[in-house]
Amino acid sequence: MYSIRKVFFLFIILSPFLAYGNLESLSNDLSLKALKESEKDIDTAMLLSQQSVVADPKNAKAWAIAGKIYLLNKDLSSAERFYAKAREIDPFLKDVKDLESLIDNEKKEE
């Protein structure tokens, strides 16, 4: 599923940021990169989204974006878990409400 090279590459790239950078900013950047990557490579997008929530576990937007990416991969149960965490952090965030709608639509299609 995930190649060792991709994981190693992401670790090497992220290590300096995790040590010295603003974790919320890093989390947001990773989330945006994950969304962009989801158009080309869903596995890399999922890795980036996981890194975004690790970088800042209190970032509701990162959890919501990760949920969207997992939903794109047709992993409804993971998307729901990401949604639950995002809602727990900030239930009023637009990204959280958007993810809720996407999940509801996916359930209706099943």
Residue map of PLM features:
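Conserved structural position within tetratricopeptide repeats
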Residues: Q51-V54, K85-E88
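Alpha-helical tetratricopeptide repeat
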Residues: E24-L35, A60, A64
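Register position in tetratricopeptide repeats
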Residues: E39, L72, L102-E109
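TPR alpha-solenoid repeat register
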Residues: A62, D95-V96
